[in-house]
Amino acid sequence: MKSARLLSLFLALSTVSVFAGIKSERQLAAIIDRTPAARLVAEGAQLKTAEAAAAAIPGAEAFWGIGESMEPLYATNTAIVVTPIAYDDVKKGMTVVYIKSNGRRVAHSIVGETRGGYLVQGVNNDEPDAEVVNEKNLIGVITAAYATTDSQFRTETTARLVAKGKIKTSNRT
């Protein structure tokens, strides 16, 4: 079984009770469309479940998420499965894991593209990260997540975006 790895979800300065972060409905729709919802599991089973799922996917790894930058989409203590992806297959809205220049692993969503790489941002952060994701620092894309609580934010945001015609189905929660 793969050893647990700590993944910093890049601590945000904002609090969870007041959602700061990404306001663009277009970006939120892409994130909801291309980032998997967390599956609910029993307390204490998050990482074990993610490790079992990762073991069934070639090259996949399980990580333990900490921090507030992806809240309320993914709460702290959400375990994630990260699957390798070709750099050219990355799309806006995917939530990827990359290695920052200081060596920390970060899970954030793709919100744009520049000549130097992809812009990424935590859904709870007001600005994109200072560093971009490129072929050298990309680890993979989140393909599954396991948590003990449901994301009310995801449910409410999905319903709002479906009502406005921004996404096609409410089957994304």
Predicted features along the sequence, with ranges:
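Extended hydrophobic leader/signal-anchor segments used for secretion and membrane insertion
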Residues: 9, 18-173
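Bacterial N-terminal signal peptides that target proteins for export
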Residues: 1-7
